[in-house]
Structures are given as C-alpha cells and as structure tokens.
C-alpha cells in the first residue's frame, strides 16, 4: 500500500489506514477479498457499473474514474455510505484515471520495467517478428527473455495467449513484474497504437524504442492516418525512452528521424546515407535456404546468414541487429548466432508435407491482414516461386471495410491465382464482406470464391504443383476462426498439412 501513497494521499487522507492490497484489476469478475478494483469509463463498457459487484466480492479499495459535472456528483453520493464506514471498501474518485493508471499500476508492482531491459516495438507490420527476433537473439547470447504481444505474453517460447497486442495498463505492469520474478533480464514488448492512444504503455522505462513502418490499419478507431501516426509517435516523443531505432525505408520513419537526431537508422538500401548512426544492407541474396545479407553499420561491417524467408525479413533482421547493437551486444557474436534464428509462428511460416515433400507445393502461412502486409508477403513469396503463386485471403468482419478492395487489388496484381475466402467474419454477413473484396478486382471472373476456408486451402493444394507457392494470408498463428461471437478451432497450418 505504501507504494500507492504518492498518488492517493492527496486524493483522500483515509487511504493511509488501509491494509496492504493483494491484487489490482479492471475486471470485477476477478476481484477477491482485499483487492483493488479500478473502474474506468471505457470505450464500450463503463466499468463503474460494476463497482457494487466488486465491493460485494471483497474489494478493499475502488478507484473510479471521475467525470465532469453531474455524473461525478451522482457517483460521489452513491458511494458516500461506503466511505463513511471505515471498515468497508473505500471508493475514491480519480480525475484522468485512465491516463495515470499505468503510473499507479507501476507503483503497485514496484516499477518492474526498471529491473530489466525493456524494448518497445511499434509499427503497422513487423512488430511481432522484430520483437520475437530481439528476444530470441538475446537468449542465444546467454540472456533470459520475455515477450509481450500479438502471439502472447511470457518467457520466450513459453507464452500464454493474450486478448490484445498491448494489454491494459495494469496487465502490462503485472506481466513485467511476473517476468522479473521468473528471472527475465530482457523483455521485447509490442506496443500497439491503441495501447499508446489509451495510455496503457505509459509509465515504463524503455531502454529502446523501435519503429518498423506505418501503413493503413485501425482507421475504424483512429479515423485518419495522421491520428494513427501521432499515436505511434508518442512512444518516441513523450514516453521515457533511452534510445530509438527507426526504419529509414519508411516515409514516416524518415520524417521521425529528422526529429530524433540521436536515433539509429535502419535501411535495406545500399545507397542510404545519413548523419545518424546506422545499419544498412549493401547486398542481399535469396535462396530456398533463406537469405544472405551483407551489411555496413556504425558498429562495423559483416554478413548475416538466416533461414528466414522474404525481403521484408531483411529489414526485420537488420532492425533486431541494430537494436541489440544499441543495447551493447557484440557484433561478431550477433553474426555468429544469426543462422540459429528461427522464424515466428504464422509469419511466412513454411508448412511441409510429411508424406511426399518433394512433389508438393511450398505452402506459406502468414498473418498479413492489411494491404501493405499482403503486398510484402506476396512479394516475399514470389522470390521463392519457380512456377505459379497462389494467394488465399479474406478480410475480417466488423473491422475496417475500406481495406478490403485494396487487398483484392494487391492480390490480383501480385499473385497468379487468387482464392477469396472467409477470414474471421465475426457478426458481419460474409456475403457483404466478399462483395467488398470483389469490388477491388478488375477481372472478377478469374477469382475463385470459396467461403469455406478449409475447402479453399484444399482446392489450392490440389491445383498446385511442386514448383508453385501457396500463400495463405490473414490468420497466421491464430488457431481459431470467429463466426458470429463464437471462436471455432481452425488452424491454417493444420489444414494445409492435412491436404499436403
């Protein structure tokens, strides 16, 4: 409780009388005896509706977000009886609670970000791969890494599934505290635009902030690209970051580099020059075995050999290399361990036939679910294609509909054969989603529409030969499909392996 006093004594003097609190939560269903319940207004659900339930379940303290005007007065009156009874739960109205919650949670969990090396990775695409590569590489060099992000949270290789890329302000601080307790000395954390806009990754001590790229996504939330970019930039301009690594091949990255003179620039362009510290590729060659990257940097020159697939992984590898160099790792050891790096589940992941691998197409599963990511995935797959390139994709329901025709146009341009299928339709009519997708094709008659995702994958594998490549885009590591409000088990990898 003492750790909370700097934040709460000014709000209410009686806080000093409270017994030590056990846990901190935003979910009233998780409240146990002696816990601290935080009631935020929320974007969809007002958590203050559940204050009574939290109190009944044994909450020792409630922090409720204060509104302006009548609502605050009503809340104050409603819970005055609890605050008059010194033996009962206390309810404190806190102005701007959402904005300062990360700081309160940090104090509650003894500021765990100060006890390990924390790397925050943001960008539309490449967050997961870059974060996973950073953590994996750190482990190869003798460290003990944890990760937080799209694939899950936990020690590297032992993650638990997470609901959001960036959890709540409380979850982020609690996870970091757990990692410290488990002995982690490093954490690579994906920082989403939602998390930044909602102050969920706020009161953290970042040893390094990484920017991968910016392209269209989440405009159902941010409304404009400018608002989306500004949310991302907060990690570099407003939060506590000791060093920054930015992608200089990205237009927004170049704009931000001009504002951040001490940042490190990463480029895959051999002609790139800058006054910043840098890591750049000077020559890149692809093969069925992976990629070979000759590079120059402010730390020295060398060559990376990796089993990863695709041109965009060149940038991911160089980004991870730059980040670890900034953090003080030895360049020769990084080069030596690079061939041991493995790809990330659902990120250009190869599915190999266990029956007859020599006579089957190469099947790649990738999480690409934005126009930019699909373009990069198809370009990457083309580098390894001797015959025809198939693209199987769909678009999620109840999400940005504007990207659907854009993704269709990209698939038509870059693939030889396209099968449009269902992704996660959620509560939206899959026929409406498909109509939006088909609006993006010039020659609709050449597109196969197969709503059933398993049947779409089966059809492509039956049609393709051993020189062809099949890209199954959109779901990546996910092992479910959301139809209506229900999650059904479905894995692109399992389905492809079944028919190979």
UniProtKB/Swiss-Prot annotation:
The modification N6-carboxylysine is found at residue 232. Carboxylation is probably crucial for Mg(2+) binding and, consequently, for the gamma-phosphate positioning of ATP. UDP-N-acetyl-alpha-D-muramoyl-L-alanyl-D-glutamate binds at residues 26, 28, 43-45, 164-166, 192, 198, 200. InterPro entries: Mur-like_cat_sf (IPR036565), Mur_ligase_C (IPR004101), Mur_ligase_C_dom_sf (IPR036615), Mur_ligase_cen (IPR013221), Mur_ligase_N (IPR000713), MurE/MurF_N (IPR035911), UDP-N-AcMur-Glu-dNH2Pim_ligase (IPR005761). ATP binds at residues 123-129. Meso-2,6-diaminopimelate binds at residues 399, 423-426, 474, 478. It catalyses: UDP-N-acetyl-alpha-D-muramoyl-L-alanyl-D-glutamate + meso-2,6-diaminopimelate + ATP = UDP-N-acetyl-alpha-D-muramoyl-L-alanyl-gamma-D-glutamyl-meso-2,6-diaminopimelate + ADP + phosphate + H(+). Keywords: ATP-binding, Cell cycle, Cell division, Cell shape, Cell wall biogenesis/degradation, Cytoplasm, Ligase, Magnesium, Nucleotide-binding, Peptidoglycan synthesis. Signal peptide: none annotated. Its main location: cytoplasm. A motif (Meso-diaminopimelate recognition motif) lies at residues 423-426. Its cofactor is Mg(2+). It is an enzyme of class 6 (ligase). One of its GO terms (molecular function) is ATP binding. Pathway: Cell wall biogenesis; peptidoglycan biosynthesis. Its EC number is 6.3.2.13. It is found in: Cytoplasm. GO terms for cellular component: cytoplasm. It comes from the Bacteria. Catalyzes the addition of meso-diaminopimelic acid to the nucleotide precursor UDP-N-acetylmuramoyl-L-alanyl-D-glutamate (UMAG) in the biosynthesis of bacterial cell-wall peptidoglycan. Belongs to the MurCDEF family. MurE subfamily. This is UDP-N-acetylmuramoyl-L-alanyl-D-glutamate--2,6-diaminopimelate ligase. It comes from Actinobacillus pleuropneumoniae serotype 5b (strain L20). The gene is murE.
